[in-house]
Amino acid sequence: MAVRGMKKNYSYLFGILTITVYLVGLLLINRGLGFTNVVVIACSMVIYYVANVYNMTGRYKLRDIVIIIAINFILVMITKFLKVFLLNEAIILFGLLTMFQIIYRYIVMIGLAEKKKIVFVGENGYTDDLLESIKKDSQYKLSGFLKEKKDINILTKKLLNLCENKKVDIIVDFTSNLLYDTKLVDKLLQYKLNGMQYYNYLEFYEMYENKLPVSNLSPKWFLENTGFEIYYNSFNLKAKRILDIIFALLIGICVIPIMIVAAIIIKLESKGPVFFIQERIGEGNKPFKIVKFRSMTTDAEKDGPKWATKNDNRVTKFGKFMRLTRIDELPQLWNVLRGEMSFVGPRPEREFFIKQLEKEIMYYNLRHTVKPGLTGWAQVMYPYGASIEDAYRKLQYDLYYIKNHDIIFDMKILLKTVTIVIFGKGR
């Protein structure tokens, strides 16, 4: 399986240690584990993730402490009302969890104080994007940017000088000829055996940005690279389909009251049908009818198809709320059950726009080699867009998803989608 992301991630360690503290708390107050506690632990892990408590990459703000305290208070009070603890026991557990998480995060941030030193060698169209990201990242420091174009030997000497002075932890190679020098390769290999990391810019861009540099990819790159198991891993595909059916049925039953209320409000707010049915292009370029709650006026496309924009006056008042919370997408659970869509995948587009985008964007057609989704990596990583440039940016994430797909990645995307819904970060 391909590597996803290279930024330090302490989520797993943080989760394991939080569970340990919870269990120690149970022992201190002489309580057994019990089924209820298992459920509370599992739910708390999910809630911490959704609330972004596990994110250790940014600066530690007062908001983070408030979120930790609030979540722990709610969780402990729930266990209190479930009669798992007495009040004084709940207070002990709350204190243990809160103090541990705050102290742990400070320890992690201190550990991140020693930044990884990165050297960029050469430059191309993606260098500036990566430079901006590195400058904002608390884990990394740009210790060199070597962009000598005329003489590769000068560039090589500068690079080796940085390595000898221990100013390099990571080399990112944007050139096409740096490794032609066999003597340089031998020396870099020795540094690598002592802990230095070397990446060509395509590898680094994918790992660091969690997307693919589409415009610099060639058919040869697709042929040689690992990943893309979504095309041939039958176990993952079957598991994905089974989970789609289970989730669609369970969620569908749970959201029936929400859908009924939404349908009534839509009908009361504006004239026209409750549902919006439109042809989209799915896997294998096969058209299918997508079903959504109508969020626009009935004459929204009287002048022809066009993308929705920010503050689009065609969107109804309740439609804005539905788009923020993704309620308008709920009827697509029917498309999932029918096998036309999956929970996770590239969002399906209309043929009218696809024809335009395939002319303008390289590899755009690859989106249609997999089943479209209710949500996707592009949707949780990039804001709603309404231009060819936005479509290109989203394709970078879509192809990254296709290359790195597995069930765990799907779960991560679904959890991020929950965050978007809860905090109203939709369109």
Q: What residue spans do the PLM features occupy?
A:
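Signature of alpha-helical transmembrane segments in polytopic membrane proteins
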Residues: 1-111
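N-terminal hydrophobic signal-anchor/signal peptide
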Residues: 2-18, 105-253
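Aromatic-capped interface at the extracytoplasmic side
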Residues: 102-115, 265-275
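Acidic, Ser/Thr-rich low-complexity segments on the non-lumenal side of membrane proteins
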Residues: 125-152, 291-313, 317-319
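Short, glycine-rich, amphipathic interfacial segments at transmembrane boundaries or analogous
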Residues: 205, 212-213, 276-314, 375-394, ...
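A hydrophobic, helix-centered structural microdomain
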Residues: 235-299, 335, 407, 412-427
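A short, structured surface patch at a secondary-structure boundary
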Residues: 309-371, 413-417, 421
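C-terminal terminal-structure detector
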Residues: 338, 361-427
